[in-house]
Amino acid sequence: MAIKDAIEKIVSYFDADEVTDHEDVAKERPVKVQKTEQTPPQQQRKPERPQETVPPRRQHIKSDVQKTQVLRSLPLSRSQVNQGSQQMNTTKTTIAIKYPKKYEDAQEIVELLIENECVLIDFQYMLEAQARRCLDFIDGASKVLTGNLQKVGSSMYLLTPINVVVDIEEISLSHGNQESTFDFDMKRR
């Protein structure tokens, strides 16, 4: 009986469906123990040892797989990490395009910022003096609401909430003379 048990243990150790075989072996053992109570305690302990080593081995394999998955994901760039965190925080980011025609339209633009929407503002339909006032109001509101206001064109600005990162390189405008006539950048001296 001991040889048969040893062979079953070896076969079940290498079997693909180890969980069900160990359960079957565990169910059979109490019956055998009841029949042969005269066996010394050392022989009863030996069959249990392979069962104890199998589950930690599975856990070791699972932890190796998890480590491999973690190592594969390590060389992500910052943009990929930012995209992942942004996807967790917000499901969708929308960009509203606004063409303000009067100063009162600035309040509507700020309300969109409060709702965490990006706003592309084009001041082409406003006079320069009104556009400066409107831009001052929007810039102040963006500071209070921890937003970001960036110039993206000669008369266009991008207003974004704090959870949106915009990476804009220097944009060379094809109409260089247009920028000089319609430039209301507040940081100019």
Curated annotation (Swiss-Prot):
Residues 22-35 have a biased composition (Basic and acidic residues). It is found in: Cytoplasm. Residues 18-65 are annotated as: Disordered. GO terms for cellular component: cytoplasm. InterPro entries: Cell_div_SepF (IPR023052), Cell_div_SepF/SepF-rel (IPR007561), SepF-like_sf (IPR038594). Homodimer. Interacts with FtsZ. Cell division protein that is part of the divisome complex and is recruited early to the Z-ring. Probably stimulates Z-ring formation, perhaps through the cross-linking of FtsZ protofilaments. Its function overlaps with FtsA. This is Cell division protein SepF. The lineage of its organism: Bacteria, Bacillati, Bacillota, Bacilli, Lactobacillales.
